[in-house]
Amino acid sequence: MPGIAEESIAERTRRVLEPVLARDGYELVEVEWLRQGSRWTLRLFVDKPGGVGIEDCQAVSRLVDPILDVEDFIEPAYDLEVSSPGLDRPLRKPADFDRYAGQRAHVKAYGPVAGTAPGSPARKNWTGVLVGYRDGAVEIDVDGVVHRVPHDQIAKAHLEYDFEADLRRKD
């Protein structure tokens, strides 16, 4: 199946399932449609306040499986997987950047972006502490300098778990 079909399946899955999951208190964070060996996999990443456990993944699977069967828009046989977004949770929506303000994150642009901070050279990657989302841009503090990255220039963004900070808190 070509890449465009993969995008269409993921997009349609999101459109169909997002409102259903929201009614049950879940956020559909990510949808992946991928081939693993000879099998196709539809992978859903879900979250809710307080986090997601194995019971939640099972409940979501039981909820969406019959809906996907009725909608019947996925042509090849596939395996359905439901998972939490994990420690490196993807950040996509403007609200994600505000929700996780104060946490460590990595932001990657499609290409070099100039003028993200005064005197800063064009760059493609930023790793630092999220400040939030304002006026169409993600603000991220990198070593004490706040950079503003236009949201429409972001290819990928995700949380980065700070193991060293966690170890310091436990000492």
From Swiss-Prot:
Any one Pfam family here would be RimP_N
Primary location class: cytoplasm
- Keyword list, A-Z: Cytoplasm, Ribosome biogenesis
Tell me the domain of life. Bacteria
Keyword flag Hydrolase: no
Q: Give the record's GO CC terms.
A: cytosol
Q: What InterPro entries does the database record attribute to this sequence?
A: Ribosome_maturation_RimP, RimP_C, RimP_C_sf, RimP_N, RimP_N_sf
Record's family?
Answer: Belongs to the RimP family.
The UniProt function text for this chain reads: Required for maturation of 30S ribosomal subunits.
Specify the protein name: Ribosome maturation factor RimP
Natural source organism: Anaeromyxobacter sp. (strain Fw109-5)
Quick one: which gene encodes this?
Answer: rimP
